[in-house]
């Protein structure tokens, strides 16, 4: 339903983004809204159980962030000494994380109002894949509401656990840094069992309108391309509509599927003689 470059070429999308940015500049209640998201409504439900694991959507040209732009929290398995010492002493990762903490210490030190402060202090949370499933209980609903600060899953090394063998504890700083760079520069989505997806595509005062449009098109291309499965190609039944918004703004349309337009395309194709 949405062909390649439809969004970039769409005058409606550009107008909507200009109007949205103007809203945020003029409306005092929106002055702190910086993230720009698209809301994608699909023809069919995705049929994927929500697991609270963000999936990366590669952006071809315009990065969202660099690791140094963000305050990043790393949550490790216990004990955390190996990971903390390796990452803080290695030149590739010494300034990558604002804090490194184990699950046990996280549970012990942060409760109630301290969890709220933790939420405010960090822009991004990443966790060792071996403890990621424990975090909804430890971090609480604040981090998981609206998917704004869901922890990303990373691996501390390329080591793979073999059956009946204990996994050797290793920490590879270069591999950790590569994962962080990918998380920061690209965008992501959370699979669900609904027919609606929200994806961040830009940041006010950081990305221009043409850059945001390109990021939107990259997102649509990835989510509709079946060759990108299982990470991509998750949209079923085509795209019905796309809206753009910030956290507190109204939703502005940038794409609406037109059955009449689709029928016209089919009629045009039927006139072609082979």
From Swiss-Prot:
Keywords: Nucleus, Ribosome biogenesis, rRNA processing
Principal location: nucleus
Additional comment: Present with 3060 molecules/cell in log phase SD medium.
Name under which the protein is recorded: Ribosome biogenesis protein UTP30
Keyword rRNA processing: yes
Organism expressing this protein natively: Saccharomyces cerevisiae (strain ATCC 204508 / S288c)
Domain of life: Eukaryota
SUPFAM superfamilies per the UniProt record, alphabetical: Ribosomal protein L1
Function: Involved in rRNA-processing and ribosome biosynthesis.
Gene Ontology molecular function: RNA binding
Family the entry assigns: Belongs to the universal ribosomal protein uL1 family. Highly divergent.
Transmembrane segments: none
InterPro entries: eL8/uL1-like, Ribosomal_uL1-like, Ribosomal_uL1/biogenesis
Localization terms from the record: Nucleus, Nucleolus
BP GO terms, sorted: maturation of SSU-rRNA; maturation of SSU-rRNA from tricistronic rRNA transcript (SSU-rRNA, 5.8S rRNA, LSU-rRNA); ribosomal small subunit biogenesis
Quaternary structure and interacting proteins, as annotated: Component of the 90S pre-ribosomes. Interacts with FAF1.
Matching Pfam families: Ribosomal_L1 (PF00687)
GO cellular component: 90S preribosome; nucleolus; nucleus; small-subunit processome
């Amino acid at each position: 339903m949405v062909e390649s470059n439809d969004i970039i070429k769409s005058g409606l999308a550009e107008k909507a983004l200009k109007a949205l940015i103007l809203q945020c500049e003029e409306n005092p209640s929106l002055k702190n809204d910086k993230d720009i998201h698209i809301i994608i409504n699909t023809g069919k439900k995705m049929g994927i159980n929500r697991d609270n694991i963000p999936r990366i959507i590669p952006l071809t040209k315009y990065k969202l962030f660099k690791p140094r732009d963000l305050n990043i929290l790393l949550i490790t398995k216990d004990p955390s000494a190996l990971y903390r010492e390796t990452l803080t002493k290695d030149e590739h990762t010494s300034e990558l994380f604002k804090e490194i903490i184990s699950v046990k210490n996280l549970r012990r030190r942060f409760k109630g109002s301290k969890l709220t402060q933790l939420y405010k202090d960090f822009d991004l949370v990443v966790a060792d894949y071996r403890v990621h499933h424990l975090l909804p209980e430890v971090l609480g609903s604040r981090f998981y509401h609206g998917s704004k600060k869901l922890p990303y899953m990373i691996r501390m090394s390329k080591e793979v656990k073999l059956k009946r063998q204990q996994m050797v504890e290793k920490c590879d700083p270069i591999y950790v840094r590569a994962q962080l760079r990918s998380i920061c520069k690209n965008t992501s989505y959370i699979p669900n069992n609904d027919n609606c997806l929200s994806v961040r595509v830009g940041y006010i005062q950081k990305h221009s309108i043409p850059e945001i449009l390109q990021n939107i098109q990259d997102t649509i291309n990835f989510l509709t391309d079946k060759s990108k499965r299982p990470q991509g190609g998750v949209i079923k039944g085509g795209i019905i509509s796309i809206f753009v918004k910030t956290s507190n703004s109204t939703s502005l349309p940038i794409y609406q599927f037109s059955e009449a337009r689709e029928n016209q395309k089919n009629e045009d194709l039927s006139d072609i003689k082979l």
